[in-house]
């Protein structure tokens, strides 16, 4: 704590987890007690801690963090970063598609998510129809139904590519998180076109294997993605 003057703590959507509220409560204690710790480290300057609800989850949590680091490298002040982050969070669009609807539905209902009904899970499994779920400002909503998981994944890739080509991204990056080996994701239809589009438009494609928490919540083999642009979702 004595090495830094300003800390941003960014959490998963408060509508999906109590982590945000707990972090806010913990921050009160930190801000009350930091003086002695900093003085022991030879630092007598003030310390600030900002807990931020990203209003999103999975790959969409990465964009605010990525942009925070970018703004820091650009030398922006903490106040400017804080103000910008509010806009980034409000413009952040996440997309989720999973191969196992029953699993995602059952896990989601435990956290208050009703975006996939029992009937949708039954019909989707029987007909191999996968919903594309949109996460934005703390809400999750199905926005498309596609036959086959790889085709649903392609719709996600195509949506990112469409928004990259259209311009106007608030953050010059798009993010992907996959619940498996990344080589599997790279082999899916639409991925190569997305990667090429990002290169052509100088937009960074940030990708990672999904963490254990994500896999537990939406299932092995799930794909999540995000882009940041003001306005409604622009779906391919």
Predicted feature locations:
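Short beta-strand->loop
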Residues: 11-13, 52-55
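Mixed-charge interfacial surface used for oligomerization/domain docking
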Residues: 19, 25-28, 38-40, 46-50, ...
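N-terminal glycine-rich phosphate/adenylate-binding segment common to multiple enzyme folds
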Residues: 1-30, 34
């Amino acid at each position: 704590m004595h090495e830094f003057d300003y800390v941003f703590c960014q959490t998963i959507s408060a509508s999906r987890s109590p982590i945000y509220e707990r972090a806010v409560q913990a921050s009160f204690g930190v801000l009350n007690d930091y003086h002695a710790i900093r003085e022991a480290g030879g630092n007598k300057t003030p310390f600030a801690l900002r807990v931020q609800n990203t209003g999103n989850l999975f790959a969409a949590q990465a964009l605010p963090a990525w942009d925070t680091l970018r703004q820091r490298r650009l030398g922006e002040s903490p106040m400017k970063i804080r103000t910008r982050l509010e806009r980034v969070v409000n413009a952040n669009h996440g997309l989720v598609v999973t191969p196992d609807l029953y699993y995602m539905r059952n896990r989601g209902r435990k956290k208050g998510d009703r975006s996939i009904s029992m009937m949708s899970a039954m019909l989707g499994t029987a007909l191999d129809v996968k919903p594309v779920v949109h996460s934005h400002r703390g809400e999750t909503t199905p926005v498309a139904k596609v036959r086959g998981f790889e085709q649903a994944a392609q719709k996600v890739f195509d949506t990112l590519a469409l928004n990259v080509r259209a311009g106007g991204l608030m953050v010059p990056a798009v993010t992907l998180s996959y619940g498996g080996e990344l080589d599997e994701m790279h082999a899916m239809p639409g991925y190569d076109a997305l990667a090429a589009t990002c290169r052509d438009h100088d937009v960074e494609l940030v990708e990672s294997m999904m963490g254990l928490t994500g896999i537990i919540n939406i299932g092995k083999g799930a794909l999540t993605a995000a882009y940041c642009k003001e306005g409604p979702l622009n779906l391919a």
